[in-house]
Amino acid sequence: MKYVNHKTIVAFLPEIGKAGSHVTSRPNLEARVDRDSHGATKLFLSSICRVMAAKETQAERGLISSCFNLALGWQLSNAMSDDTCANPLLLGWIKEWLDQARERNTKGVTVYKKAYESMKACPLTFQHPSEAQQLNGLGPKLCERLTNKLKEYCKEHGLPMPEDPRTAKADKRKSTDGDTEGQPAKKARKPKPYAPALRSGPFALILALSSLDENSNQSMTKAELIEKAQPYCDSSFTVPSDPTKFFTAWNSMKILLTKELVYTRGHPLKKYSLTEEGWEVAKAIKKTAQKSIQNTLPFDVQSDVTADEPRTAQREDLASQRDFERQIRPGLQAHNSQRHTLDSLENTLDNSTITPIPISPDNFTVQLILDTREVRTSKDRDYISNELIRKGITPEVRALEVGDTMWVAKFHDPTFLRKYGEEGDEIMLDWIVERKRLDDLIGSIKDGRFHEQKFRLRRSGIKNVIYLIEEFAVTHHESNAAAAQKYHDMVASAIAQTQVVNGYFVKRTKNLDDTIRYLARMTFLLRNMYSAPSPPSSRTSARPSHTLALLPTRHLALSSSHISALNTLRAENPHVTYGVTFPTFCAIASKSDALTLRDIFLKMLMCTKGVSGDKALEIQRVWPTPQAFIRAFEELTDPKQKENMVADRMAHVMVGRKKIAKVLSRKIAEVWGGLPG
């Protein structure tokens, strides 16, 4: 019989002998077997009782004799093997715990067996159980349990408790050091218990395994474990966060196995379970996680998130929430004091040349739009969309004229805008994201796309531009350290320029998964901003914090500059979002369609290296058209005058770092004035 406790059988030997010779003693033996034995040992002793109740006297005597010999043999062999150990007392207690674990068929069998074998093979005699930590399989917790057992043993037998050698050495140092008299002895530094980072791979795996019953023998396969753990982890267990790497969150399982928090069994299909130390870590994580969840701010996503989706997809940390509020809620405090309503919107704009059309929040929902070129790799084009769907956001994927991600107000009724003479069923919101991976950002700076994209973003009229920079490992050879530093300075300068000069919000993310989480949080927040509270409060108005108004396309066609009109309207009503229909926005932001002569001239000027958007604008103000610019050069006959024409003319307009230097002026003259290079 497997996992039979030998000591329990030895304890039953006298009563087994009595029951063999006296029939009246058998009921007492059966009652004690039922009360004092467990598991395989109980099954073994019960079978003896049943055989002794049989009528074959010869078989009964033979079985009892065999049991005596078997039990005595176990006792002698164990005693001999334990006596050869340098620490028989400690070994005996570990053996006792190992037998108990085998009887109950618990997960501690593996731990105690490893500790038993290490202690048995150790030739060193330990003065204190704490010294056993140097053995493989004996950690601080098991040594602490041995120490408590030794204290009980010494108290029971009237023996002095051995002193911990580490404490004794500290006391000795204190007594021999006369200069340090009066100073408290330094406490021995206890090893810190393992604490995985929040929403990391080990964190998710431990939480998933803790969903099993601690007192059962249950376990999980890899597929089951990944399915359970994924909602608790920010990284994917199946797809690497970096396309150039092969590591996923599943690689953290090796850490848990090394630290003996998880053990495996079964071959070839491995199954995973928590050890006793693993269960302690899991309980500590759950206590910490409960406090963390109480500090989170849930978003209202009832219309998009199904009931069986994890709650973690709807919760976001407080730090990220503050980051968003600092970015996109600058006008909320002023709005709370004024309480503007949709009814007063038309009255405030009666004297304006453009009359916006107020839109009720009940007519639309906020929809996330992704560019078709936003993919993880060429072979995994749907990764971003699928991950957003898992987080409760269903994006629409289409080709965008500008930006990589934007948000629109999508009407429930597709024909809603027709009564105002507009096409489509979507109005642009004032939020757009330009996503740049770090290597792509460096490339766009080098080839000029960086400035051209920012120029089109400004011309689109979108107020809140988010420049999202995704970290990426850009490797350089050791011999090319100077180039690496150059790229680092280039990126830092571009980020500073984007924030200070262009006034865009720069968001840096660690990887693609972090970017996806950011887009999901932004979508939830915008939905809260543009939707009325539900249920409405009886004391406060049930109006959203931001309202939406449509700028008719016909007014934009008559307006000399829709951007200046937008700026005027936004200054008068900062809490109102003024948007155009999506088709109109695409026409305005198109790279080639509906370009004015001014726009073409600006793009032509920016083709010269060193001419930024601001410098091109100032040049265009002095010489409105390409023809005027060329004629200005033709009127000058002296090559030196042509070379310095732009620099001299712009000297009083642009100062400081924005000033056009003589070198740049010569470059412009070579292109536009026919000056030989």
UniProtKB/Swiss-Prot annotation:
An annotated GO BP: mitotic intra-S DNA damage checkpoint signaling
Keywords of this entry: DNA damage, DNA recombination, DNA repair, Endonuclease, Hydrolase, Magnesium, Meiosis, Metal-binding, Nuclease, Nucleus
One Pfam family from the record: ERCC4
This enzyme's EC code(s): 3.1.22.-
InterPro entries xrefs: DNA_pol_lamdba_lyase_dom_sf (IPR027421), EF_Hand_1_Ca_BS (IPR018247), EME1/EME2_C (IPR042530), ERCC4_domain (IPR006166), Mus81 (IPR033309), Restrct_endonuc-II-like (IPR011335), WH-like_DNA-bd_sf (IPR036388), WH_MUS81 (IPR047417)
Function: Interacts with eme1 to form a DNA structure-specific endonuclease with substrate preference for branched DNA structures with a 5'-end at the branch nick. Typical substrates include 3'-flap structures, D-loops, replication forks and nicked Holliday junctions. May be required in mitosis for the processing of stalled or collapsed replication fork intermediates. May be required in meiosis for the repair of meiosis-specific double strand breaks subsequent to single-end invasion (SEI).
Name this polypeptide is given: Crossover junction endonuclease mus81
Gene name per UniProt: mus81
